[in-house]
Amino acid sequence: RDGWPNDVAFAPAAGADDVLKQAKLYHSISEATKTISLLFATTARKRVIGTKSLSIFKAIEKSFEHVVNGGNVGFLFGPEQSGLSNDDVVQADYTVSIPINKEFSSLNISQAVLLICWEWNKIKMSFLNDDKNLVKINKKLKKSTELSNVGDREYFYKQLDELLTKSGFFYSSEMAPVVKRNIRSLFNRASLTHQDLRTLHGIIRSCLLYTSDAADDD
């Protein structure tokens, strides 16, 4: 809104210049998260779009374990006035809620970020205080999950959308956005690996070839 980088931001950052200097500006969530393999969306209200929900404590535990095993983790925070839209949330693997007074469930973005970072730092310090864990980190672990990243999933959704559009699956233009969100939610709940995506791409290619051959025969 005010442009970035912005010199005005450094004074209230109270010396955290390194953090600000590493901050990057992106024009879309898909662009910002394309290398992320486990994405969480913070939300104050219960969603009905099918995305799995975790408490902040479970989310931090799961995210830290993923990082230790070589994955990339991201947390999405929405605008203070409106929060994340359903289209934003459906791009995440999980939604995260912070347990606070239900009558005052809205936090400003700095408070939400602080709480997530505080819980993350707590589990990190506990982990690093165990010498056995330090040895484990230094051993260059093999990824236990090899989850696909958001960028790869976005490409898959684009290909799938093309196939479903050609086949006439979206019979109602009004309902198409809702159906697409539901499809994303369905696949995101499956925690797709790179191998899963390769298999799904193979299925899509086969279907596209079939429909193309059928059209030629006609």
Language-model-derived ranges and their functions:
Residues 88-137:
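Structured adenosyl-cofactor binding patch, chiefly the S-adenosyl-L-methionine
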Residues 3-82, 125:
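S-adenosyl-L-methionine/SAH cofactor-binding core of RNA-modifying enzymes
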Residues 77-79, 86, 97:
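Long, low-complexity intrinsically disordered regions in eukaryotic proteins
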Residues 1-2, 46, 100-104:
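Short, acidic/turn-prone active-site loops that include or flank metal/cofactor-
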Residues 130-208:
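An accessory alpha-helical subdomain
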